[in-house]
Amino acid sequence: MKQDVRRIALAAVIPLFLIFILYLLKFLEVGMDWDFRRLGVYPMEQRGVFGIFAHPLVHGSLRHLLANTLPLFFLSWCLFYFYRHIASYIFFAIWIGCGALTFLIGKPGWHIGASGIIYGLAFFLFFSGILRKHVPLIAISLLVTFLYGGLIWNMFPFFAKETTSWEGHLSGAIAGTICAIAFMEYGPQRPDPFADEEETPDEESGEEGKEYEEEENTEVKADYN
């Protein structure tokens, strides 16, 4: 029980720390009257290269940040809880992959916010659970579909608002899907359903042999007397 509670708490450390940084930067931006938008991705221009690494840390408004907070925490917590041994690699790959793809396919302008990370995490958790065919992970896939299935519409220019970076959303989804495939052989795996059955015959044969030897020894002693 204590180990479960500890694991739950540890899985929340990095998500909470990241969210703390996001709010700290937003309050600094507002309080000091700074403009962090130039830390975002500007596609296919040199000034936008740094944004590949920094764009998830910047949000256009407090409302934008508030909208991203809960899904970012929940999805990243799921990643670090269920995939704890490979979570850091996946999170980093989605972060950089989302920024790099946005840099390549985005429309001119500054692309900011952690929405791409959210899409990346959602698509990773969904496809990873399906590909691994492991019941707890499939349950997470279904839960993600139930909670965030509507996100898919904001990946396309036909449904997204003009001010929404649908390219960032699509980039995150692609990065998450690629990670689900690339890391499929790592981390939690479906247990082998035949593992116990393969061991049972050996154990049973050992027990039968033991009983046979005991009976044989008894008969020898009787003849000797």
For the regions a protein language model found, what residue spans apply to each?
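A detector for small-residue-rich transmembrane helices and their helix-helix packing motifs
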Residues: M1-E215
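Short, charged juxtamembrane terminal tails flanking transmembrane helices
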Residues: N217-N225
